[in-house]
Amino acid sequence: MENLIHVQKTFEKIVYVDKKVNNREFEDCVFKNCDLSNSDFSYSSFMDCEFIDCNLAMTKLSGTSLKGVLFKNCKLLGIQFEECDDFLFNVNFEE
């Protein structure tokens, strides 16, 4: 995830706990069984992405753009969605 731009990638079983990975762009990406808890994704952009069975507890999303993002069966405890960029904000949640 070190690159700044990611398009049509699948991230599986990635452990990025307590990491600072802000100012990244993700388009049409899938995150499966990833642990991103307590990481900082501030000022990043997620467009048409899916998070499936991921742990996103306490993830920081300040100024982050979420457009067409699906969270399916994810742990989302403590995420401050109100701090996200509200322009075209569009998220869906499934169990």
Regions found by a protein language model. Give the residues of each.
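Tandem repeat scaffolds
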Residues: 1-95
